[in-house]
Structures are given as C-alpha cells and as structure tokens.
C-alpha cells in the first residue's frame, strides 16, 4: 500500500526488486491476481509514474505472464487524473490488466481522500 514504510515494518516491499520478489513468492502459493502500489526508488514515497510500474510489471511478467495485474490509481497523494492514470498508458506486456480508480470520497484513519467534484 501507500502507507507502510520501512520504519513502520521492515517487511514492507518498497523497491521494485522487493515488490517483484514478494509477488513471485505469492505466485508460488497460488495467487491469480495482484494489486500493486509503486514507490520512488530513492525516497520510497508513493508514485504514479508509469516508468516505475513498467519495471515492476516487466519483472512480474517474466515469471507470471498470465497473472492479472491491477495497479493503484489512488488519489490520496496525487489529485490530477492525468497523474493517476499514467500507468494505464503503458503498452504491450507492460500494460496492467486493471487499475483501481476510486472516484468517491474515502475516510481513512487520519485523513480523508477527496476528489474534485469535476472528477466525480
């Protein structure tokens, strides 16, 4: 997800290689679908950038070409639809199968995720 950090738990995968390795272990247990969040490699902050999603998806497709891949299009940190939809512009086997684009208002523990009325 977007919230856990290495400070909160050392077990959260935040780097591309960590995410891919965790998905591989889950595939070995029999998953057929995965929901991904991407992080900036240096800051480990959540990101919408398709280039980072491409690295993750490409790594997964090497060992699980039929796995259904859903990417986060969260508006919690990035409000513009162009940013949120960026991973959907990937092509070929790097294109995700699904994207979770939540357009409603969501209440979280410490904050709310709000969308502009024009996006609703």
Predicted regions and their residues:
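Hydrophobic faces of well-ordered beta-strands that scaffold small-molecule active sites
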Residues: 1, 34-36, 67-73, 97-101
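Active-site mouth loops of central-metabolism enzymes
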Residues: 1-20, 72-83, 110-112
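Alpha-helix N-cap and loop-to-helix initiation/capping positions
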Residues: 10-18, 44-52, 114-118
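Extended substrate/RNA-proximal surfaces in nucleic-acid metabolism proteins
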Residues: 78-120
């Amino acid at each position: 997800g977007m919230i856990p950090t290495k400070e909160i738990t050392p077990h959260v995968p935040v780097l591309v290689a960590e995410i891919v390795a965790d998905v591989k272990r889950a595939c070995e247990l029999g998953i057929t679908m995965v929901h991904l969040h991407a992080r900036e490699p240096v800051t480990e902050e959540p990101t919408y950038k398709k280039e980072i999603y491409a690295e993750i998806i490409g790594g997964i497709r090497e060992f699980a070409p039929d796995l259904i891949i859903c990417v986060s299009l969260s508006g919690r940190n990035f409000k513009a639809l162009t940013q949120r939809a960026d991973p959907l512009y990937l092509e070929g086997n790097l294109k995700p199968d699904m994207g979770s684009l939540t357009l409603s208002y969501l209440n979280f523990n410490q904050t709310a995720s709000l969308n502009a009325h024009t996006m609703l």
